[in-house]
């Protein structure tokens, strides 16, 4: 029952995330826009609490996407390890993304999602686009 519910939730979450992301003309291609910041946040979520975590994140996603500088915010779940969740984000600048993270900290959101995390798992990585 739990695995079936998780599979349904994963499909629904994937559909919602893709359906909610309204790309600008610049991000409709398959490439990160020049000058934009691309990052991933790699998380390990308690396998017993993945469904709850995704519900909280999907509820918060519209606020994230509405932040100044956010071009794209998607959530992905590992097909073979549902506790492995990755956020894929594109921002106009690192400063805007860091201001967003500060806002989430100030509002208590990070403390709210902390109990879902597996200690020592995850990380945030900023990437530069290499043209060539």
Model-predicted regions and their roles:
Residues 57, 61:
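Short amphipathic alpha-helical/adjacent loop interface patches that line ligand
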Residues 1-10:
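Bacterial N-terminal signal peptides that target proteins for export
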Residues 131-132:
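Short, solvent-exposed mixed-charge patches
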